[in-house]
């Protein structure tokens, strides 16, 4: 494509420049305010003649200049005065670093575009009354082979080469890598090495009432193991692990030899660890607050602990940081008063304030270049250009249509209605290519707003974004050739378009992608967005006057609406006018900030004045749903997002784990790689190994599946891996090796068998042969299970491994437990899947865990079984095999064949066989009632469809649970064009038979079922906003069933938003009656399922 070579730079306010030239020269003293000269002593890399003393240069540096200009000034002085001038002729300024010392640490002055007077070192020297300050000029050395090898190891773990900058148009990736060094080092230096090594999994939430009932006199029994012996001791639920160890050693004072404890050792030499798991009970936390202890109490299991030596904190050693630190002032510009061109001599202007740019923003569309044309002939094409901020389109223009050829040239300027000074930080220039048949697009002028009629007939083909203000706060300028993303066709990938269209990354596949050439105005100086200086709001007092009662009620009604309720223009106007009143109610914040006109600089300044007075927000209790709302795709302002992150700081580790999936997705909505949210995730991952483990897999999975955000997730993951320590790096390496090896085996097995449900004996034989080869050659001897880092799997039990009868041919694998302190020989069962995106299953299982925590606050234990499931790559993942459980289909078939679907008594008889003792049978029925109620409510609220007897399971203790969540939010499956879901949830006659009832009869167990359902349903209604927000944040991730707000409307309807508590109760009881009336339809579907073998055996036991 031939492009123009030169465009004239824009000259800002020519009249101002002429006026400045006529000004009389002022004295040095008077000019310091506009062009401050700062004395700095530079220590040069060369030595004085005949000594080892380094040369120095004392310079007076212009405060308004940037670092690059300062470096050039040093170089010119060195060339003039150094005894080693040849050295400076040979090596230019870019071969050297500028370093300064602060509190014993070396910091690099990294950003060459940073204005000198904003440097952190100047502020530091001022506090110390040090003048002149000292900057060391140090030669840049090539990385050592050891450094390069470590980087290769990190890149392999990340699944992406973070050093590859061939597909970026600026240095944001490298810039962020450097900026994240400081928070990483601060967190590593501040963490407790012993606690980090043992990462106790605790909670500070009160013990639920139903668990309190299981503790007699506030005491629990603990079995402590050592070697081949054990000792049972009675302890208070309020005792800490340290107290328990002390009591144990007092009791065993004369029997140490029985427990294989050397006489010289005491309680300080040991810790308590869960038998068979890498899970420690340490710290000053009462034993009742350890999650493992609560799990044992909940399941009625004994608490078995092993007396163990603590792990060596040295194993978590972090490799010495090779990069100097960069401070948080790096990349920050000055205030408007420092950058403005007004009242300054021309010679004193080095960087110009964006707020001085009063002209409208414009872009020149030069042309597009496509490697392969669409097959359809006689098409025309046009470019639509939007200034976008989050989900808001601030203004829009488009070119005229032209015939669609391999190269289309426009060479036309599009001028927008927004002024340059009003561009907010994070604003995107969104470029989209539309095409359509020639008549549909005729007669349009170049800068016209698109007509809905013509655009409706055109098809969006390609898109790309450019951040208009870069990560350094500088306005983009000059020519760009941007490689565009192609819009996915129909299918699963289309679901991610909502998130993908916010990315500022260009398509790395340069050879095969559409490219667009644009030109932005050039300027004589860099244009910088100034920092906002907190100033009083002159309108503040006027708008804080007493509100009329009618308007107050109207405002309260707006604030009370749920997150899906759209705000009208009138609503927004009211919220903004009474912004100081809205500020008093934290619930108003998402709606208030949605009402801000982010494309007006004066309004943005007033918004920051508001944010400075957010005491009510800071002092309010944490509302996770509310806080997460400010992190969704509707908010791009870094200050708004930062107050949300600041609120999340009070989340305890267990809650961070609950919401980690959404928090990782929310990183996509950040305009820049470095953000408060990215730093929060980094910090919490480095503080707790369990969080770090899941952060690793959530990030790695996104890097593998989301090309649009690969770089962003990769830079965060690299920062984490550089601080997590040697032991974690070793664990991750083993896990990645295992997954890579099993993936190859799965692909080979799939290629051996056609895409059908049966599995031949030849395929099973091949699997066993391949697994034996792995075991004998290079499979790691042990590895942490990705969905449960407390478990370590050892050798494969090959005779128990098989290929499952399903289209995707998942592998059923069983491993020995690698921990010798495990109490049984039970294997660790894992289903390894290739070909399915497990992120939707992960989301549903995560929501089930959150529902459990909601019900816990109401003292409800609904016996949900959210089994382990994790996506480990692009359509790769692992699912936990739940022990001693089977599908309803198997139970029905094993008794009377396919007609078992119509036999009401089959399930009850099976449970009786598994629990022959009456007391155990009654306990199993009780568990069945609660778990059935829990899953009825959960599957109804989440709209989980495609429920058949092969994806509903039951354990031998009566715990019902659902698996395989491919259809959610009411996106139900049809069979022969008929909707298969004729009931709100699954409550079949055989389920009712277990509860002691049939037809319209009742029983004590059925009444209990109804009561529990209603309590569980009403409890979820109190958290409607949280559930809506959690799904909203996953809306843009690429899940085929979660692509629009209409999908999430399902939850709103299911929870009867707007109805009274009494009406909601009646509504759910009515749903139960619908299920009782139509239970036979489910049985008929199940019969068809058994006969036709639809998805038969796809996910047995997980």
From Swiss-Prot:
Mod. after translation: Autophosphorylation at Ser-1101 has no effect on the phosphatidylinositol-4,5-bisphosphate 3-kinase activity.
Regulation: Activated by both the alpha and the beta-gamma G proteins following stimulation of G protein-coupled receptors (GPCRs). Activation by GPCRs is assisted by the regulatory subunits (PIK3R5 or PIK3R6) leading to the translocation from the cytosol to the plasma membrane and to kinase activation. When bound to PIK3R5 the PI3K activity of PIK3CG could be activated greater than 100-fold by the beta-gamma G proteins.
Name of the gene encoding the protein in the UniProt record: PIK3CG
Annotated C2 PI3K-type domain residues: 357-521
EC number: 2.7.1.137, 2.7.1.153, 2.7.1.154, 2.7.11.1
Organism: Sus scrofa (Pig)
Annotated ATP binding sites: 829-838, 864-872, 961-969
Protein name: Phosphatidylinositol 4,5-bisphosphate 3-kinase catalytic subunit gamma isoform
Location of this chain's protein in the cell: Cytoplasm; Cell membrane
Domain PI3K-ABD: 34-141
């Amino acid at each position: 494509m031939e492009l123009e070579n030169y465009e004239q730079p824009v000259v800002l306010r020519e009249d101002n420049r002429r006026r400045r030239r006529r000004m009389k020269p002022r004295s040095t003293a008077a000019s310091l305010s506009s062009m401050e000269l700062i004395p700095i002593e530079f220590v040069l890399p060369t030595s004085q003649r005949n000594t080892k003393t380094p040369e120095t240069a004392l310079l007076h540096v212009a405060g308004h200049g940037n670092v690059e200009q300062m470096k050039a000034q040093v170089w010119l002085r060195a060339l003039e005065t150094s005894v080693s001038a040849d050295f400076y002729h040979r090596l230019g300024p870019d071969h050297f670093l500028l370093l300064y010392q602060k509190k014993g640490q070396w910091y690099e002055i990294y950003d060459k575009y940073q204005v000198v007077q904003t440097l952190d070192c100047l502020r530091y020297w001022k506090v110390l009354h040090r003048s002149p300050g000292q900057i060391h000029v140090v030669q840049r050395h090539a990385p050592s082979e050891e450094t390069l090898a470590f980087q290769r190891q990190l890149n392999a773990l990340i699944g992406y080469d973070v050093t590859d900058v061939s597909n970026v148009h600026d240095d944001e990736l490298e810039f962020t890598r450097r900026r994240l060094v400081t928070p990483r080092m601060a967190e590593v230096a501040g963490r407790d090495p012993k606690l980090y090594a043992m990462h106790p999994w605790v909670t500070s939430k009160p013990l639920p009432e139903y668990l309190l009932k299981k503790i007699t006199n506030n005491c629990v029994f603990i079995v402590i193991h050592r070697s081949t012996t054990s000792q049972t001791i009675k302890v208070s639920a309020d005792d800490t692990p340290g107290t328990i160890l002390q009591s144990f050693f007092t009791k065993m004072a004369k029997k140490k030899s029985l427990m294989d404890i050397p006489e010289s050792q005491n309680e300080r030499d040991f810790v308590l660890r869960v038998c068979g798991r890498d899970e420690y009970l340490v710290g000053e936390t009462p034993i009742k607050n350890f999650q493992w202890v609560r799990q044992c109490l909940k399941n009625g299991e004994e608490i078995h602990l092993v007396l163990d030596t603590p792990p060596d904190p040295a194993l978590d050693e972090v490799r010495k940081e090779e990069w100097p630190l960069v401070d948080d002032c790096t990349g920050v510009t000055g205030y408007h008063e420092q950058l403005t061109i007004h009242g300054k001599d021309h010679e004193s202007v080095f960087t110009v304030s964006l707020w001085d740019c009063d002209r409208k923003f414009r872009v020149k569309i030069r042309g597009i270049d496509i490697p392969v044309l669409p097959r359809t002939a006689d098409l025309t094409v046009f470019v639509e250009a939007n200034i976008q901020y989050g989900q808001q389109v601030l203004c829009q223009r488009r070119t005229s249509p032209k015939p669609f050829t391999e190269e289309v040239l426009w060479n036309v300027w599009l001028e927008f209605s927004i002024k340059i000074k009003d561009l907010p930080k994070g604003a995107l220039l969104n470029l989209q290519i539309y095409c359509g048949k020639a008549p549909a697009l005729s007669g349009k002028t170049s800068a016209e707003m698109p007509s809905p009629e013509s655009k409706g007939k055109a098809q969006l083909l390609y898109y790309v974004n450019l951040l208009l203000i870069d990560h350094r706060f500088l306005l983009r300028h000059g020519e760009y050739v941007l490689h565009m993303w192609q819009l996915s066709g129909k299918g699963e990938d289309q679901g991610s378009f909502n998130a993908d269209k916010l990315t500022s990354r260009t398509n790395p596949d340069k050879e095969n992608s559409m490219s667009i050439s644009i030109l932005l105005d050039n300027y004589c100086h860099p244009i910088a967005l100034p920092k906002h200086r907190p100033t009083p709001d002159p309108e503040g007092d006027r708008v804080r006057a007493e509100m009329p009662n009618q308007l107050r009620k109207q405002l309260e009604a707006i604030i009370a609406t749920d997150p899906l309720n759209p705000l009208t223009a009138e609503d927004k106007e009211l919220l903004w006018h009474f912004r100081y009143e809205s500020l008093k109610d934290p619930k108003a914040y998402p709606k208030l900030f949605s009402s801000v006109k982010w494309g007006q600089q004066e309004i943005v300044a007033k918004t920051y004045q508001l944010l400075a007075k957010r005491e009510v927000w800071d002092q309010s209790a944490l509302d996770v749903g509310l806080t997460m709302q400010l992190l969704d795709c509707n908010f791009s302002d870094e200050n708004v997002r930062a107050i949300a992150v600041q609120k999340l700081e009070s989340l305890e580790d267990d809650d961070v784990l609950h919401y980690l999936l959404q928090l990782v997705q929310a990183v996509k909505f950040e305009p820049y790689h470095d953000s408060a949210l990215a730093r929060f995730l980094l910090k919490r991952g480095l503080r707790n190994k369990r969080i770090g483990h899941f952060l690793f897999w959530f990030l790695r999975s996104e890097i593998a599946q989301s090309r649009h955000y690969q770089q962003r997730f990769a830079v965060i993951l690299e920062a984490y891996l550089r601080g997590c320590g040697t032991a974690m790096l070793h664990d991750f390496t083993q896990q990645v090796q295992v997954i890579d090896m099993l993936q190859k085996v799965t692909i080979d097995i799939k290629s051996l068998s056609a895409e059908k449900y049966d599995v031949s004996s030849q395929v099973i034989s091949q699997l066993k042969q391949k697994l034996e080869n792995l075991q004998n050659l290079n499979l790691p001897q042990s590895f942490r299970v990705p969905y449960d880092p407390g478990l370590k799997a050892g050798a494969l039990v090959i005779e128990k491994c098989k290929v499952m009868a399903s289209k995707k041919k998942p592998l059923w694998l069983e491993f020995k437990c690698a921990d010798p302190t495990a109490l049984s020989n039970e294997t660790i069962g894992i289903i390894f899947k290739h070909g399915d995106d497990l992120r939707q299953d992960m989301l549903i299982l995560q929501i089930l865990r959150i529902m459990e925590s909601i019900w816990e606050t109401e003292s409800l234990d609904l016996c949900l079984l959210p089994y382990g499931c994790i996506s480990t790559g692009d359509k790769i993942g692992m699912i936990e095999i739940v022990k001693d459980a089977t599908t309803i289909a198997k139970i029905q078939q094993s008794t009377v064949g396919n007609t078992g679907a119509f036999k009401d008594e089959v399930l009850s008889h099976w449970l009786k066989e598994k629990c022959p003792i009456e007391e155990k049978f009654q306990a199993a029925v009780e568990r069945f009632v609660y778990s059935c109620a829990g899953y009825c409510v959960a599957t109804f609220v989440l709209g989980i469809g495609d429920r058949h007897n092969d994806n509903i399971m039951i354990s031998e203790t009566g715990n019902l649970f659902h698996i395989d969540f491919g259809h959610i939010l009411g996106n139900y499956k049809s069979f022969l064009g008929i909707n298969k879901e004729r009931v709100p949830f699954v409550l079949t006659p055989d389920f009712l038979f277990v509860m002691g009832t049939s037809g319209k009869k009742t029983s004590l167990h059925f009444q209990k079922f109804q009561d529990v359902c209603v309590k569980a349903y009403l409890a979820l209604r109190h958290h409607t906003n949280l559930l809506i927000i959690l799904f909203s944040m996953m809306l843009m991730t690429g899940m085929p069933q979660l692509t629009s707000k209409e999908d999430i409307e399902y939850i709103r309807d299911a929870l009867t938003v707007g109805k009274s508590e009494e009406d909601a109760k009646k509504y759910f009881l009515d749903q139960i009656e619908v299920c009782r009336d139509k239970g036979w339809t489910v049985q008929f579907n199940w019969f068809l399922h058994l006969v036709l073998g639809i998805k038969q055996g796809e996910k047995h036991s997980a």
